[in-house]
């Protein structure tokens, strides 16, 4: 049975449009609270990023949880991985994140973590959706008895707890002293956390895009817009730059030359560092979108590589299935399960900094062992949300077949719908730049015409 509301990363959409409305959020809180209250401590944590709509949705979810008899602990603006960690340490039934990650401010979303710090499984989400449907369509939402209503409290030391957790993943014998780092927090949830983590570990930090006003989150900054970070690294003659997205679950780097180091290259750096010390256990999990250059570079070190479906939840599932610990996406979602239960931009960045220090080389030098193959990704925005019917059209399928025949064994094609936006993503990868671009545009034109 497929999920109706939960996409690859929870519920997400434009604020004010269903389902990102106060009414939906309240009923979702009630449905989730009813399911969670049947087994656990009857307490949830709610964190959010810096979007102005977070206040509205937070209050609505509070009401829903309270109506279900579940207590709520509010931790304010907080990175998504911090909510996953704190839900576990506070022994809550679940953590709730109100965020649309790297999306613009006018979008928002809601996702859940279990008390073990992982995403809810499909079965739990289906159970919540079944109750939610009744609340939305049959007016089935009912309060518990007055004396059993949930209470709400604020936790003031959540940021400090998470900062110490992040620092604890970095070896005690190492220091960032002597490193000049530019940190771009995307005017997002880590604006008051990330710079302090690196400073407290000894780095000289230049912090940019750290003044959220509710509407500037991810606005030409952060992990999806690296221009300002590249400029700042060059202007300040920094050793490197670190960019997080709005909820700090993904990270990208810029080396001292101003060149981008993406998630695929980060995975290579971490695998290479572990391999050089004889500490690489198992292999690496990427996704269908991972650059073929990563797979080839890992193969040179005899490190196994498998591809999961796109979405960090599926990378986690594949890691658990294989028993491996390292995985991620080119977009900067990095999973290092020996350190964190979910993708954590700050924690992943610290592991890269560890690799830089231990190698006694620059970031630019330690990424040089991987050569990225030309990869073109075209996002075709849809007028309607019916991506499945477009993907099923004969003209689109024939375009893919022709492109694959043209590329042969020198490349690959991937066509998929976005789990978070009304987009179809066209990805083509091959050994030749011109061939890659031409075939990607050919397929994208077929999608637009469908």
Curated annotation (Swiss-Prot):
Keywords annotated in UniProt: Isomerase, Magnesium, Metal-binding, Phosphoprotein
EC number(s) stated in the UniProt entry for this protein: 5.4.2.10
SUPFAM superfamilies: Phosphoglucomutase, C-terminal domain (SSF55957), Phosphoglucomutase, first 3 domains (SSF53738)
Gene Ontology BP, a term: UDP-N-acetylglucosamine biosynthetic process
InterPro entries the record matches: A-D-PHexomutase_a/b/a-I (IPR005844), A-D-PHexomutase_a/b/a-I/II/III (IPR016055), A-D-PHexomutase_a/b/a-II (IPR005845), A-D-PHexomutase_a/b/a-III (IPR005846), A-D-PHexomutase_C (IPR005843), A-D-PHexomutase_C_sf (IPR036900), A-D-PHexomutase_CS (IPR016066), Alpha-D-phosphohexomutase_SF (IPR005841)
Cofactor binding, per record: Binds 1 Mg(2+) ion per subunit.
Record's GO cellular component terms: cytosol
Active site: 101
Keyword Repeat annotated: no
Binding site for Mg(2+): 101, 245, 247, 249
Top EC group: isomerase
Needed co-factor(s): Mg(2+)
Alphabetical list of CDD domains matching this protein: GlmM (cd05802)
Pfam family, one: PGM_PMM_IV
GO molecular function: magnesium ion binding; phosphoglucosamine mutase activity; phosphomannomutase activity
Record's comment on post-translational modification: Activated by phosphorylation.
Positions bearing Phosphoserine: 101
UniProt record similarity statement: Belongs to the phosphohexose mutase family.
PANTHER family given in the database record: PHOSPHOGLUCOMUTASE (ALPHA-D-GLUCOSE-1,6-BISPHOSPHATE-DEPENDENT), PHOSPHOHEXOSE MUTASE
Function: Catalyzes the conversion of glucosamine-6-phosphate to glucosamine-1-phosphate.
Name listed for the protein in its UniProt record: Phosphoglucosamine mutase 2
Organism (species): Shewanella baltica (strain OS195)
């Amino acid at each position: 049975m497929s999920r109706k509301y939960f996409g690859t990363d929870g519920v997400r959409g434009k604020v004010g449009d269903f389902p990102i409305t106060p009414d939906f959020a309240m009923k979702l809180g009630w449905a989730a609270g009813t399911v969670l209250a049947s087994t656990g401590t009857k307490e949830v944590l709610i964190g959010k990023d810096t979007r102005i709509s977070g206040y509205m949705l937070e209050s609505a979810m509070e009401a829903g949880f309270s109506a279900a008899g579940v207590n709520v602990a509010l931790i304010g603006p907080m990175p998504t991985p911090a909510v996953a960690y704190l839900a576990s340490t506070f022994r809550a039934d679940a953590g709730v994140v109100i965020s649309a990650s790297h999306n613009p401010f006018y979008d928002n979303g809601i996702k859940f973590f279990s008390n073990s710090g992982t995403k809810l499984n499909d079965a739990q989400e289906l159970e919540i959706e079944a109750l939610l449907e009744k609340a939305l369509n049959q007016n089935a939402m009912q309060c518990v008895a007055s004396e059993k209503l949930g209470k709400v409290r604020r936790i003031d030391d959540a940021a400090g707890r998470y900062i110490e957790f992040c620092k604890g993943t970095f070896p005690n014998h190492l220091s960032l002293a002597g490193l000049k780092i530019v940190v771009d927090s995307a005017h997002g949830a880590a604006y008051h956390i990330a710079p302090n983590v690196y400073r407290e570990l000894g780095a000289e930090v230049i912090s940019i895009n750290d003044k959220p006003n509710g509407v500037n989150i991810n606005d030409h900054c952060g992990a999806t817009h690296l221009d300002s970070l590249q400029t700042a690294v060059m202007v300040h003659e920094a050793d490197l730059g670190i960019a997080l997205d709005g909820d700090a679950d993904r990270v990208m780097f810029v080396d001292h030359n101003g060149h981008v180091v993406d998630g695929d290259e980060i995975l290579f750096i971490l695998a290479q560092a572990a391999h050089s010390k004889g500490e690489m256990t198992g292999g690496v999990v990427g996704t269908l979108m991972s650059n073929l250059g990563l797979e080839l570079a890992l193969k040179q070190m005899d490190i196994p590589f498998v591809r999961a479906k796109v979405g960090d939840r599926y990378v986690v599932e594949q890691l658990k299935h294989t028993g491996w610990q390292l995985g991620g996406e080119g977009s900067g979602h990095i999973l290092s399960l020996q350190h964190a239960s979910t993708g954590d931009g700050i924690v992943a960045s610290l592991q890269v900094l560890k690799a830089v220090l231990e190698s006694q080389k620059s970031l630019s030098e330690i990424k040089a062992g991987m050569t990225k193959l030309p990869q073109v990704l075209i996002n075709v925005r849809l007028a309607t949300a019916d991506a499945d019917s477009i993907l099923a059209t004969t003209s689109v399928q024939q375009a893919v077949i022709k492109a694959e025949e043209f590329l042969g064994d020198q490349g690959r094609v991937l066509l998929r719908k976005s789990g978070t936006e009304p987009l179809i993503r066209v990805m083509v990868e091959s050994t030749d730049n011109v061939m890659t671009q031409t075939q990607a545009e050919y397929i994208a034109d077929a999608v637009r015409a469908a």
